Amino acid sequence: MSTAFRISDAVPQPKSMEFRRRDLHVGAAIGSHPIDHDEVYYVLSGEGEVVADGVLALISKGKAAYLYKGSVVGVRQMGSEPLSLIIAYPVTPK
């Protein structure tokens, strides 16, 4: 299970970036999925692993993962405390 927080809703419109906090509880994961824009995952606390196109990297507090448009990505919480991330990506124009 995870909890998501939209932290950029108060930004005046139109905005060009979205920022969300995502807390992955112990044992939680965001399964592999394709992305159609670049994304940055910044770790606030906890430990985990991120996979992009089959390449696995460990992430922990203070580290960031830059994920590229067209990649298939996923992230998984590891350890005894939740993995708390800021996820940033561009807003798709409507």
Language model regions located:
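Short, conserved beta-strand element in jelly-roll/cupin
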Residues: D23-L24, I35-V50
